[in-house]
From Swiss-Prot:
Alphabetized SUPFAM superfamilies for the sequence: CinA-like, Molybdenum cofactor biosynthesis proteins
SMART domains named in the record: MoCF_biosynth
Pfam families to which the protein is assigned, alphabetical: CinA, CinA_KH, MoCF_biosynth
Family: Belongs to the CinA family.
InterPro entries associated with the record: CinA, CinA-like_C, CinA_C, CinA_KH, Competence-induced_CinA, MoaB/Mog-like_dom_sf, MoaB/Mog_dom
Species for this entry: Salinibacter ruber (strain DSM 13855 / M31)
Chain coiled-coil ranges: none
Protein known as: CinA-like protein
NCBIfam families found in the cross-reference section: cinA_nterm, PncC_domain, PRK00549.1
Domain of life: Bacteria
Length: 412
């Protein structure tokens, strides 16, 4: 099944809001075996929405639109859809009652514009919104083409998709034509990974494709095969085995696994605990570790020691080490890791001290420099990394480097 996505809203075009809906839907549809062929973003303009809707509906069997389902004057999706299909808008009394109950539960007056939320084009089915007021809409044409309308608020969009859209799609013919398998790596960049894997053309053949999907925590390798072929599963197994043989312990798992979850499993398997001493990452390591359910089994806490005075008084870093080597140095990173390990009584301590930028760099320590420290009962070391010039991106990369340092050291 081919699909196209139309995301609607001026806020998306001007960069006021990040279009997370497109990324989320693309990933979810891909896992369902739906082939996304095009994604378009348009503003709150009737003609633009109509034009892009017409193109998508002509080219794809499934069209998903997000945004423009609210009750305000710039929420145009319902009326454009009604015009496109020549279907008059109707008020659904059941939806209208649910809208009233939604506001009553929150002790809020029902706004005069709220009844617009209960309108739907004739022939469309409503999809209940378990977390908001704006319902989704579903339409299946006699020729099997599908159009789905979802709210633009990400939490509402995902809730409706998971509860109502995905189950319906799974019943459709043509879904699952593409079979994917994702291998997750850590601690190696895209270029280095490509060089390590070498030429895979003989292994891939003509029936399996490989895509490199880099992120701040590693590179995902997505294998794709035609699910209609009876050999698809076996071929994916063969290619995966070849990649694992070449990549070794750079591969940390499959599917949606995360670096922090894999590290957590390694700690739990060893009945070990961890704490982080963070300077440049400002608590991001702790944030990522606590994003894993059950992380209280092994994560005890963090010390954000941004100033040199905090490094000395809280973590016990030597004044002489800072004076001789600087705060961004191997010696300080090691002492920070050991200091937080002793302070919190953990098995493992990790640390980051670096220059996230955009200022603060020197010829010897340019922006993007970070030292990652590691300490346990028998091992104390630090490793230097050089990343980019963007502050936000560097913080993510620094945190990933620390998590990966702990994972690799524990796996030895």
């Amino acid at each position: 099944m081919k699909a196209q996505l139309l995301t609607i809203g001026d806020e998306l075009l001007i960069g006021q809001t990040t279009n997370t809906n497109a990324a989320w839907l693309g990933g979810r549809l891909s896992r369902l075996g739906v082939r996304m062929t095009r994604t378009v973003t348009v503003g709150d303009a009737r003609e633009a929405i109509f034009r892009e809707l017409d193109r998508a509906y002509e080219e794809a069997r499934l069209v998903i639109c997000t945004g423009g389902l609210g009750p305000t004057h710039d929420d145009l999706t319902r009326t454009v859809i009604a015009d496109y299909f020549g279907a008059p808008l109707q008020t659904d009394p059941d939806v209208l009652e649910r809208v009233r109950q939604y506001y009553d539960r929150r002790n809020r007056d029902v706004p005069p514009s709220a009844p617009a939320l209960a309108q739907r084009p004739e022939g469309f089915e409503t999809l209940d919104n378990p977390v908001g007021a704006a319902v989704g809409l579903w339409h299946e044409a006699p020729d099997g083409r599908l159009i789905v309308l979802l709210p633009g608020i990400p939490e509402e969009m995902t809730a409706i998709f998971e509860a109502s859209v995905q189950p319906r799609l799974e019943e459709q013919s043509g879904v699952g034509e593409v079979r994917h398998r994702t291998l997750v790596t850590a601690g190696i960049g895209e270029t280095a990974l490509q060089e390590k894997l070498g030429d895979l053309s003989d292994v891939l053949g003509d029936d399996v494709s490989l895509a490199y999907l880099p992120s701040t925590s590693g590179v995902r390798l997505r294998l794709s095969a035609d699910a209609r072929q009876t050999t698809a599963g076996a071929r994916l197994d063969t290619v995966e085995a070849a990649i694992r043989e070449r990549a070794g312990d750079d591969i940390i798992g499959t599917g949606d696994v995360t670096l922090e979850a894999v590290l957590g499993d390694a700690l739990r398997a060893r009945d070990a605990t961890i704490a982080s001493a963070e300077s440049a990452t400002g608590g991001l390591i702790g944030h990522r570790l606590t994003g894993v359910s059950g992380s209280s089994d092994y994560y005890l806490g963090s010390v954000v020691a941004y100033a040199n005075s905090a490094k000395k008084t809280v973590l016990g870093v030597d004044e002489a080490a800072i004076r001789e080597h600087g705060a961004v140095s191997e010696a300080v990173a090691v002492q920070m890791a050991e200091g937080v390990r002793e302070a919190l009584g953990t098995t493992v301590g990790v640390s980051t001290t670096g220059i996230a930028g955009p200022t603060g760099g020197t010829p010897d320590k340019p922006v993007g420099t970070v030292w990652v420290g590691y300490a346990d009962a028998s091992e104390r070391h630090a490793r230097r990394h050089q990343f980019v010039e963007d502050r936000t991106l560097n913080k993510e990369l620094f945190a990933s480097a620390a998590l990966e340092e702990a994972r690799r050291t524990l796996s030895v």
